[in-house]
Amino acid sequence: MGTCLEVMKMKTLSLELAKLAMNLVEEVEKDKRDDYLRDVKGLGSMIVQNGLMGTILFLKKKGKNKVVDHLGKMIEHLTLEDGIVERLMENEFLDARTYLKAQIAALECAKWLKRCGEVLLGGEENETT
């Protein structure tokens, strides 16, 4: 079990991610909210199945730039690594440790984007109204 200070740091970081995700999701244009929500709902499983690089390439190819941008901003915030997504897109070498750190961060970020998306953009309970 971690010390009280470690637990407080984790809670603070989690709160920071939640706020960042909320701010990012709120900037999604009204006419793109349904697509964005659908994309972030599947983001975590996509990262698990295809890895971070595969997910980013797929999303870019499909024109899901807002999701990629938001994921990149959150990964940078969590890892303190600048331009991870851009570096991956430019095929810049990343050592295994940096890549895995970014991929683990991406999973945490995907969770917050999904949660905020469901709350702010409609979620399942509002799909029938």
Curated annotation (Swiss-Prot):
Positions of disulphide bridges: none
Swiss-Prot/TrEMBL keywords: Antiviral defense, Cytoplasm
Subcellular location: Cytoplasm
InterPro entries: AF1862-like_dom_sf (IPR023101), CRISPR-assoc_prot_Cmr5 (IPR010160)
Listed transmembrane segments: none
Listed Pfam families: Cas_Cmr5
One record GO biological process: defense response to virus
Gene3D superfamilies per the UniProt record, alphabetical: AF1862-like domain
Keyword Cytoplasm found: yes
Gene Ontology CC: one annotated term: cytoplasm
Similarity annotation: Belongs to the CRISPR system Cmr5 family.
Function: CRISPR (clustered regularly interspaced short palindromic repeat), is an adaptive immune system that provides protection against mobile genetic elements (viruses, transposable elements and conjugative plasmids). CRISPR clusters contain sequences complementary to antecedent mobile elements and target invading nucleic acids. CRISPR clusters are transcribed and processed into CRISPR RNA (crRNA). Part of the Cmr ribonucleoprotein complex.
Name recorded for this polypeptide: CRISPR system Cmr subunit Cmr5
